[in-house]
């Protein structure tokens, strides 16, 4: 048994313990003068301490309260700060995250005004050999979305995952992941369905894979994704592949994006271990 930390407020201690339980780490609380948090499996100590540092930065983060709800441990002893909606958006998103979101919204509005086809003529993957040197096309397909649900779903994930990467690892890392995954997921998708596709989902899947594996292999990176969410991503890929919902999905982009994210996370976490 290893004591991780002590909290003066028992509800704060319980919130942290509940959250770590959702991550597969079992902690116990022993009440003395304060609430002492103990870890049974000492091999998980590094991961727990990394998460503790994040928790202490912002114990009011909604994910901690959500974990307490799942565990049935909510009460009035712990008071969470409340943030206005846009303040919460600003807190998590860096400049690259915002620029991408704004660009997608502007393109979406243009598609509603001018029509999908007109915008795709300018932004779609090169659909004619004469366009192969219009290099922006290899990336701008990610800006196009064909329904309100499509853009909302992708931008929510982009904000959640991309914002975390940018805040923890820097704008440069997010740009690199975005450009590589947009290029390779677009290439794969055009092999599947031709050049007439669009959406940020290939990049989103890359971020899912990157954040999950980097968090698993390098907890001190400060980024992480719950295993349940990566399982959801895999189920969604399978559902799209077998057309279970009767929806048109960019299956090639999803698979390629996820593979890119996992590969980049593996390399980055390997380099991080070598630097230690």
From Swiss-Prot:
Keyword Ribonucleoprotein: no
Entry keyword annotation includes Protein transport: no
Signal sequence residues: none
Residues at the catalytic site: 201, 254
Protein's cellular compartments: Cell inner membrane
InterPro entries, per database record: GlpG_N_sf, Peptidase_S54_GlpG_N, Peptidase_S54_rhomboid_dom, Rhomboid-like_sf, Rhomboid_protease_GlpG
Family named by the database record: Belongs to the peptidase S54 family.
Record-linked HAMAP family: Rhomboid_GlpG
Protein name stated in the entry: Rhomboid protease GlpG
Provenance organism: Shigella flexneri
């Amino acid at each position: 048994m290893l004591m991780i930390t002590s909290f003066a407020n028992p509800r704060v201690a319980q919130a942290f313990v509940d959250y770590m339980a959702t991550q597969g780490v079992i902690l116990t609380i022993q009440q003395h003068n304060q609430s002492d948090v103990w870890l049974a499996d000492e091999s998980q100590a590094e991961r727990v301490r990394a998460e503790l540092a994040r928790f202490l930065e912002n114990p009011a983060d909604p994910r901690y309260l959500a974990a307490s709800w799942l565990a049935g441990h909510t009460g009035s002893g712990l008071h969470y700060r409340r943030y206005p909606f846009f303040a919460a958006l600003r807190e998590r998103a860096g400049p690259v995250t915002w620029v991408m979101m704004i660009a997608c919204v502007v393109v979406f509005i243009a598609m509603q005004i001018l029509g999908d086809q007109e915008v795709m003529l300018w932004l779609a993957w090169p659909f004619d050999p004469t366009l192969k040197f219009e290099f922006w096309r290899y990336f701008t397909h990610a800006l196009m979305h064909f329904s309100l649900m499509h853009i909302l779903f992708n931008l929510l994930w982009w904000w959640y995952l991309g914002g975390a990467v940018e805040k923890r690892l820097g704008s440069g890392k997010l740009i690199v992941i975005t450009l590589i995954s947009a290029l390779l997921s677009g290439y794969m998708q055009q092999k599947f369905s031709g050049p007439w596709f669009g959406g940020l989902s290939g990049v989103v899947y890359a971020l899912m894979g990157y954040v999950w594996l980097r968090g698993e292999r390098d907890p001190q990176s400060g980024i992480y994704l719950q295993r349940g969410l990566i399982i959801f991503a895999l189920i969604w890929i399978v559902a799209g592949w077998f057309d279970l919902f009767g929806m048109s999905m960019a299956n090639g982009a999803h698979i390629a994006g996820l593979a890119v994210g996992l590969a980049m996370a593996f390399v980055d976490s390997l380099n991080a271990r070598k630097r230690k």
